[in-house]
Amino acid sequence: MLSRSRCASRAFSRSLSAFQKGNCPLVRRSLPGISLCQGPGYPDSRKTVINSSNIFSVRFFRTTAVCKDDVITVKTPAFAESVTEGDVRWEKAVGDTVAEDEVVCEIETDKTSVQVPSPANGVIEALLVPDGGKVEGGTPLFTLRKTGAAPAKAKPAAAPAAAAPKAEPTVSAVPPPPAAPIPTQMPPVPSPSQPLTSKPVSAVKPTAAPPRAEAGAGVGLRSEHREKMNRMRQRIAQRLKEAQNTCAMLTTFNEIDMSNIQEMRARHKDAFLKKHNLKLGFMSAFVKASAFALQEQPVVNAVIDDATKEVVYRDYIDISVAVATPRGLVVPVIRNVETMNYADIERTISELGEKARKNELAIEDMDGGTFTISNGGVFGSLFGTPIINPPQSAILGMHAIVDRPVVIGGKVEVRPMMYVALTYDHRLIDGREAVTFLRKIKAAVEDPRVLLLDL
């Protein structure tokens, strides 16, 4: 009896183990009872029987799919205070498998684009917002069925080995026909029926070439198509029109001799790169010179509050640097420039430029700014009048460096020259202050020692 109990325990343990694995089918017999210890060593009169009504009838039951799967709803992240809504552009579709932190959609706002990643590995079950739809912060975007580890990408199947060329059946060589005997006499030449007459060359009419097919008159395409303005372009258009309608914009010009700054850059760029791992450019010189001039002329760093009719003077200097991207012009901000040196400025410009190229600029990177620098010279612009970036009161426009003849000490010399333009709000800034400000920038760029000596 004891041996039969042990046999029943072992059989039941095996059945329970097969059930727990979840991948093995459990099949119920069609008999009224199941004998666990039935065999040739045990008499049928003393069988240990478990009633079939107490055994689960389960076929291909998988516990992992039921216990581990979980559906979550992903919502729109919170926007900055100045942004209320955005447009959705989907990168994935229903049924796509995504890995954790993989971008599922992109929300384009007035100032930048916000990427929404997947919070976990899983499969997208539903898209709750249509492509191009408007969403606010906290709006449900899509549902995701979580799974285990992200499925490994299938390796490309190896190209099947080239099949060996089938051996063509050998065709028995047919003996060539016997060669004809070589003639020993020339055959007679038949005489022409009519005698040949010679004609002068002038009498021979050239054969007319076939007429060329006249090319049809070129018809230019007169089609047109429309594209919806993205949110960033709409915002740029709105802000620039507001600036034009609000500010009394006036532009003053000057020119800068770039000889000294070019010489300084050529002399120290290698040492600068070795120490700071950064390239020394011209933008850092203009940013530093602008901060120096803004401290001398604080009204250029101020702004009019139209609501209260007050002038707001900023004691800090945050300079916006215009960067062109495929989506439009963005202006990330370099903050507290008055406390920076050339290396700090170059490092910040490099980081912001890299984020702009990768479309990773956040709203915080572009908020604020007390003065803007726009460098149209990188595109070859020789002369231009930039538009103020509200809520600021002035903007500096840099242009291309061109060798031009100039008079130096009573002699004509060829120097690398750059035109610079300062557009300012004439409601707040007078002409004298604007010209003085621009001359300060000119002096600091032409002779960087001015910054060291605080002249």
UniProtKB/Swiss-Prot annotation:
Domain Lipoyl-binding: 71-145
Transit peptide, residues from-to: 1-68
Cofactor note: Binds 1 lipoyl cofactor covalently.
A Pfam family matched in the record: Biotin_lipoyl
Region (Disordered): 155-220
Compartments, record wording: Mitochondrion matrix; Nucleus
Positions bearing N6-lipoyllysine: K111
Gene3D superfamilies: 2.40.50.100, Chloramphenicol acetyltransferase-like domain (3.30.559.10)
Bias type Low complexity, positions: 155-173
Modified residues (N6-acetyllysine): K155, K269, K274, K275, K279, K309
Keyword Cell inner membrane: no
Active site: H426, D430
Protein EC: 2.3.1.61
Cofactor(s) recorded in Swiss-Prot or TrEMBL: (R)-lipoate
Pathway where this protein functions: Amino-acid degradation; L-lysine degradation via saccharopine pathway; glutaryl-CoA from L-lysine: step 6/6; Carbohydrate metabolism; tricarboxylic acid cycle
Listed GO biological process terms: 2-oxoglutarate metabolic process; L-lysine catabolic process to acetyl-CoA via saccharopine; succinyl-CoA metabolic process; tricarboxylic acid cycle
One cellular component (GO) term of this entry: mitochondrial matrix
EC category name: transferase
CDD domains (alphabetical): lipoyl_domain (cd06849)
Subunit (UniProt): The 2-oxoglutarate dehydrogenase complex is composed of OGDH (2-oxoglutarate dehydrogenase; E1), DLST (dihydrolipoamide succinyltransferase; E2), DLD (dihydrolipoamide dehydrogenase; E3) and the assembly factor KGD4. It contains multiple copies of the three enzymatic components (E1, E2 and E3). In the nucleus, the 2-oxoglutarate dehydrogenase complex associates with KAT2A. Interacts with ABHD11; this interaction maintains the functional lipoylation of the 2-oxoglutarate dehydrogenase complex.
Role noted for this protein: Dihydrolipoamide succinyltransferase (E2) component of the 2-oxoglutarate dehydrogenase complex. The 2-oxoglutarate dehydrogenase complex catalyzes the overall conversion of 2-oxoglutarate to succinyl-CoA and CO(2). The 2-oxoglutarate dehydrogenase complex is mainly active in the mitochondrion. A fraction of the 2-oxoglutarate dehydrogenase complex also localizes in the nucleus and is required for lysine succinylation of histones: associates with KAT2A on chromatin and provides succinyl-CoA to histone succinyltransferase KAT2A.
Protein family membership: Belongs to the 2-oxoacid dehydrogenase family.
The protein's name in its UniProt record: Dihydrolipoyllysine-residue succinyltransferase component of 2-oxoglutarate dehydrogenase complex, mitochondrial
Organism expressing this protein natively: Bos taurus (Bovine)
Source taxonomy: Eukaryota, Metazoa, Chordata, Craniata, Vertebrata
